[in-house]
Design a protein with these regions (language model features):
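Short amphipathic, positively biased membrane-proximal segments
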Residues: 1-202
Length: 202
């Protein structure tokens, strides 16, 4: 999830091209479990990117909702590549607990800026935590390493967004650069994980 000013700059143009380019890359790969759902997640991500080109509360909530749907689609795709329950592993259970703590902290930070954002941010953060845990539960031969890297980078990117928006007053070029870099890398890794899994099944 990324936030930028509503202007045609190399950065905003790059964001607009990112998801369509990755969708084409995925479409050119052999069809595999979850690939159609990932394409749906990419569509929601693209809608979120466009919404977050503005800085109003309405645009932020629209972007948040789009990325929430994207993460739900990613969860569904990852579950199709897993043969174990998400919470079967103690490490994943500990991560979910830690993610819940981070979600609470982010919601409290959001409430300092705008109390109406607290609940949506909490729900979004919990969903993001579930997405990362689902990636960790993917079978190793189904692209788990790259999928987990992508999901983890998504968590880093969105945490940086929270820090920038709710703690740094929506300022900080280095933070914004970190958001954009980790976000692009996250989406790329997820596509490569899906492609790696499809090659192993071929």
């Amino acid at each position: 999830m990324t936030t930028t000013a509503p202007a045609f700059t190399p950065r905003t143009v790059g964001k607009a091209l990112l998801m369509p380019s990755l969708a084409v890359r995925l479409l050119r790969s052999p069809r595999s479990p979850g690939s159609g759902t990932v394409l749906l997640a990419q569509a929601f991500s693209y809608a979120g990117d466009l919404a977050l080109n503005g800085r109003t509360r309405g645009r932020f909530l629209a972007g948040l909702s789009s990325f929430l749907l994207a993460h739900l689609a990613y969860i569904a795709a990852f579950r199709r590549r897993s043969s174990v329950p998400v919470l079967a592993d103690p490490g994943r259970r500990r991560f979910v607990v830690a993610g819940g703590t981070l979600s609470t902290a982010m919601a409290l930070a959001a409430a300092r800026t705008d109390r109406t954002l607290a609940a949506p941010v909490a729900v979004y953060s919990l969903t993001l935590t579930a997405m990362v845990a689902s990636a960790a539960a993917v079978d190793h031969d189904q692209g788990r390493d790259r999928l987990l890297t992508g999901a983890s980078l998504f968590l880093v990117s969105d945490t940086l967004i929270g820090v920038r928006k709710f703690l740094a007053g929506d300022r900080g070029r280095l933070l914004e650069a970190g958001v954009l870099t980790t976000y692009a890398a996250a989406q790329w890794c997820i596509v490569e994980g899906m492609r790696a899994g499809s090659r192993r099944r071929a």
